[in-house]
Amino acid sequence: YFNYEFFVELSLSIPDKLLIITAEHNAKLIGASLFFVGNESLYGRYWGTDNNYDSLHFETCYYQGIEFCIKNKIKHFEPGTGGEHKISRGFTASKTRSAHYLKHPDFSTAVKRHLHIESQNIERYIQDVQKHSPYKTNNNCINRLA
């Protein structure tokens, strides 16, 4: 994904907006998660490891992010896209957005067509997943403690 220069640029341009959670075993770095800190939100996006460690992904991507939010009184934690396993850990499904520029017109048309179908499928998926939400609902709104 990202090269060394990417991380150097992040550290120089937005050092106060970065949170990196690292995991070590026997004084060796074995994994890390990259988060972006907003005014009222923490955004988790990328993680990596050198091997397959039981529950390391959940610890570095979710549990440590939750602890950071509690400690720093951050109201919202968006741990990243995808993953049915997030529901059982207290997260609800939410829409995310992205922007892309596709120069080739035929490719752009094909992607737009696919995204139209995909967005309908995602909408249905979110509705299905919300049925398993750990939060009470009232008038189609999810009640959460802030």
Regions found by a protein language model. Give the residues of each.
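Mixed-charge, polar/low-complexity N-terminal
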Residues: 3-5, 9-10, 16, 66, ...
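Terminal substrate-recognition subdomain of acyl/acetyltransferases
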Residues: 76, 82-146
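A conserved beta-strand-loop-helix scaffold within acyl/acetyltransferase catalytic domains
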Residues: 1-53, 133-146
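Acyl-donor binding region in acyl/amide transferases
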Residues: 41-105
